[in-house]
């Protein structure tokens, strides 16, 4: 089980990313627009740098919803491979069966 602080830090990053998503997208659009003047470009760049580091979507780590494990995350089910195996063998994931040939 990972430290609670790591899980809470990730939750904070998710919250910050959602909170600043619109502003970040607006500034990125200004930077991507080729018709932007130099003053507007550098102004948008400065504002983007002033946003919190953790408000960037890239800094969010996918974690297992049951155990909090950050590695071997299966996105379709939202759990790690270990939890996925336990749930699948217990028959708690509909449509998932153990392969046999």
From Swiss-Prot:
One of its GO terms (cellular component) is cytoplasm. Gene3D superfamilies: 1.10.287.1480. This is Small ribosomal subunit protein uS14. It comes from Opitutus terrae (strain DSM 11246 / JCM 15787 / PB90-1). GO terms for molecular function: rRNA binding; structural constituent of ribosome. Part of the 30S ribosomal subunit. Contacts proteins S3 and S10. Pfam families: Ribosomal_S14. The keyword Ribonucleoprotein applies. The keyword Membrane does not apply. Keywords: Ribonucleoprotein, Ribosomal protein, RNA-binding, rRNA-binding. Binds 16S rRNA, required for the assembly of 30S particles and may also be responsible for determining the conformation of the 16S rRNA at the A site.
């Amino acid at each position: 089980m990972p430290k609670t602080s790591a899980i809470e830090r990730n939750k904070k990053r998710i919250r910050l990313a959602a909170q600043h998503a619109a502003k970040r997208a607006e500034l990125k659009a200004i930077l991507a627009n080729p018709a932007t003047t130099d003053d507007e470009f550098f102004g948008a760049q400065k504002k983007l740098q002033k946003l919190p580091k953790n408000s960037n979507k890239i800094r969010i780590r996918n974690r297992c919803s049951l155990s909090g494990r950050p590695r071997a995350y299966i996105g379709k089910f939202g759990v790690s491979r270990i939890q996925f195996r336990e749930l699948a063998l217990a028959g708690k994931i509909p449509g998932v069966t153990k392969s046999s040939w």
